[in-house]
C-alpha cells in the first residue's frame, strides 16, 4: 500500500515511510504466519500523510455495502443505475490515486493516473477490468487523490 501511495503522491517511498513513522515490518500478531503477523499499514495512515501534503483522499467503492450492524447476516450491495463498473472506471479515467483489491494471494494496491495503472510489482497498463484481472488484480476500491481546496472536474 505505501508503494502505490508514494507513486500516486509522487514522493520517495523513504519519505512516505518516515512520515508514517514505521515500515510496517514489526511483528504484532506473533501467532499468525508470515506475512499476516506483520503490522503492515492502515489506509488512514496513508490518508494522514496525504492530508499533511495538501491532498484529500476519497474512496470510490466498486460495490458499496449497506450493513445495519458490524456483525450478522444482513447486508445489501448498492447497485447504481448507471452500472457500478462504469462508475468505477469513470473515476479512474478522470483522476489519479490508488486502487486497492486483491492479488493472487493477498491484498494488493496499485497507483493510477487518468486511466493508466502503475503497479508497484512492475507492470504499467491501461485500466480495464479485464486488464487488471489479466494481471491477477481484482479491484475493490479506488482512493482518489485530489489537491485540497480544488474543485474536481468530471
Model-identified regions with their sequence ranges:
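Active-site nucleophile-adjacent alpha helix/oxyanion-hole segment immediately C-terminal to the catalytic cysteine
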Residues: 1-36, 52-53
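Extracellular and analogous surface-interaction loops
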Residues: 8, 84, 146-148
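Conserved active-site-adjacent core of cysteine acyl-enzyme catalytic domains
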Residues: 27-107, 112-122, 128-133
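Noncatalytic regulatory segments and standalone regulatory/sensor domains
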Residues: 116-154
